[in-house]
Amino acid sequence: VTDPGFTKDISSWCEKTGNTLVSLDREENSFRCLLKKGRGDEEVSKQDLQQDLQQASSNSLQENATLVVFSGDLDKAMASFIIASGAAAMGKQVTMFFTFWGLNIIKKANVKTEKSFMEKMFSVMMPKDASKLPLSKMNMGGAGTVMMKKVMKDKNVDSLEYLMQNAKNAGVKMIACAMSMDVMGIQEEELIDGVEVGGVATYLGEATEGNVNLFI
C-alpha cells in the first residue's frame, strides 16, 4: 500500500471491526501490514463483537463531534472553528476532517517542495494559507475579504488564525484527507503543525462515536 493515510486507516478499521493489527512496517515508499482475525489470542464471535461495538458507541456517543470541512471559504472556515471550539468547551472530543478545498485552510505559506507541473498549477491557483481565503459571497476579487476583515477588526471579532490556534489549544483534532492531498498536489510538509494525515476510514471511525456530525 502506498497511501500515507493508510497507517491511520488500518488502525481505525481494526479497532472498529474487532481485528488485531500485528505489525505495520514502512518499506521505502510503501507500507506493509500483518492482520490477525479477532482480538488478541482469541477470535471474537459476531455476537460478541456487535455487543462490544454497541457498548463502545453507547459510552462515547455524547462525547464526540466531527466536522467535515470541504469548503475553503473564509466565512465557512470561521464558522467551522467556532463550532469546533464551542463543542470542545462543552466537553466533547472534536475531530475536524479537511478535504479538497478545505485543505487550503490548514496550509503553511511559502513551503518549498518538489511538485509536478500540474501540482504547481494547483498551487498557483489556490490560496497559499488561511490568510488568503476568499469569501463565499460578495468576494469581489478579494475586496470583499478585505472589507470583512476590517469590519471584524473594528468590532473586535477574532481572526481565523486566532480561532484556529484556540481550537488547537482546546484539543481539537485536525485530520487532512490523504486522497484529496494527492489529487490537489498538497504534501504533508505544507500542512500546519499538529495536523494528522488520514483517510475516510479514519474519519468514519471518529464519526461513528459521536452524535454531532457536520459537513461544511
Language-model segments: residues:
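Core SAM-dependent methyltransferase catalytic element
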Residues: 32-46
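N-terminal beta-loop-helix "entrance" segment that forms/cooperates
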Residues: 7-10, 104-115
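Histidine-anchored nucleotide/phosphate-binding helix
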Residues: 78-92, 96
